[in-house]
A protein has these predicted regions:
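Flexible loop/turn connectors
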Residues: 249-349
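N-terminal helix-turn-helix DNA-binding module of bacterial transcription factors
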Residues: 1-73, 343-346
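Amphipathic helical "hinge" segments at domain boundaries
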Residues: 58-125, 130-133, 214
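Periplasmic-binding protein-like
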Residues: 130-138, 195-197, 229, 250-260, ...
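Short helix-capping segments at alpha-helix termini
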Residues: 102-103, 152, 217-224, 249-252, ...
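Short beta-strand segments enriched in small/hydrophobic residues
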Residues: 23, 28-33, 68-85, 185, ...
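Short beta-strand-centered segments that line the small-molecule binding cleft or hinge
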Residues: 120-177
């Protein structure tokens, strides 16, 4: 294949068919035929074109015929959230869309269900659509695969979870501090027997919450090695079963911290199933719909997903408008809302 200089490849722009054609030593029309799966292309020629496309990280543009504006923007964003089952993700999505609408921009959204492979597939789909910017919640352990896109100048902002392997903006909750505050709240009520119910350990947010909760207990003199820590409880049923086992054990906790809203739902069901919802304290991370209507009301460390989504979207548009400031890590504070379940004292007090 023909060699291609950095200036030819346009290091600050996405590769085009022209770049692929030059590297493969063929006509642009030949590249178009290969990309579109048209017949009458020799197998060896098609192989050279595909090899060149891979080498340049070329992504076909399904809307190329519609791109005639001088700025070449599609007026779209790609948004990747954790799971459509989780109200938190829905609130982030809504906030991003509210900002995008103000700018006359549409949002393509997808959920990853905390699957690293799905993350990369969704991002690739967004890039094929030539979105102007990306707002991403991640599940994979490294996002270095986005480096070529960042070099081309595509604005990328991470929301809820920080990236690894790339330097760019991230907007996150104070997961460590919020979990520590939950522990301090329960300690202040006199509790000494705790249980921790955690989300997937592979998730950065879950690890930060676990660390915040356990370090606060440790600072208060609680032997954390004796605290039951049960993780990878990603849905209500697993959380329910885990807490039932603890409640039925020889030394049940007097206070429970659940590190995610769906886990909290399972914990609530277990406590009510055993008739322990009035004598076992519970604090959840993330608010739960109708939490104030329960009896007792549910005490939570509330995140502010609407702020996370809004700030992330504002950062993308700032970058699109020429903001070249260094990468920022923006931490959004959490709020402990006391409604009753977290204020239950241990039996005998």
């Amino acid at each position: 294949m023909t060699s291609l200089s950095e200036s030819d490849a346009g290091s600050s722009a996405r590769p085009t068919m022209r770049h692929v054609a030059k590297l493969a030593g063929v006509a642009v029309k030949t590249v178009s035929r290969v990309v579109n799966g048209e017949p009458n292309v020799a197998p060896e020629t098609a192989r050279r074109v595909l090899d060149a496309a891979r080498a340049l990280d070329y992504q076909p543009d399904p809307h190329a015929g519609n791109l005639r504006r001088s700025d070449r923007r599609t007026r779209t964003l790609g948004l990747l959230v954790s799971s459509v089952d989780n109200p938190f993700a829905g609130a982030v999505h809504r906030a991003v869309e509210d900002v995008a609408v103000e700018h006359g921009v549409a949002v393509f959204a997808s959920s990853l269900d905390d699957d690293p492979e799905r993350e990369r597939e969704a991002v690739a789909a967004f890039l094929r659509r030539r979105v102007d910017g990306l707002i991403l919640t991640t599940a994979s352990t490294n996002q270095a695969y986005l480096e070529p896109e960042l070099r081309r100048g595509t604005p990328v902002v991470f929301v809820d979870r920080e990236p690894r392997g790339v330097e760019t903006d991230a907007v996150v909750s104070d997961n460590f501090g919020g979990a520590a505050r939950a522990a301090e709240h329960l300690l202040a009520r006199g509790h000494r027997r705790f249980a921790y119910l955690g989300d997937l350990h592979s998730l950065q947010t879950a690890r930060h919450r676990r660390r915040g909760f356990l370090e606060a207990l440790d600072h208060a003199g609680i032997p954390v090695a004796d605290v039951p820590v049960i993780e990878d409880l990603h849905d209500p049923e697993r959380a329910r079963e885990a807490l039932l086992r603890l409640l039925d054990g020889p030394n049940p906790p007097t206070a429970v911290f659940s590190s995610q809203n769906l886990v909290t739902v399972g914990a609530l069901r277990a406590l009510r199933e055993r008739g322990r919802h009035r004598d076992t304290a519970l604090v959840g991370f993330d608010d739960v719909e109708l939490a104030d209507l329960l009896e007792p009301g549910l005490t939570v460390v509330a995140q502010h997903p609407e702020d996370l989504g809004r700030i992330a979207a504002e950062r993308v548009f700032a970058k699109l408008n020429g903001d070249g400031s260094p990468s920022q890590r923006i931490v959004v504070s959490t709020t402990l809302i006391a409604r009753g379940s977290g204020e239950i004292p241990p039996s005998g007090m």
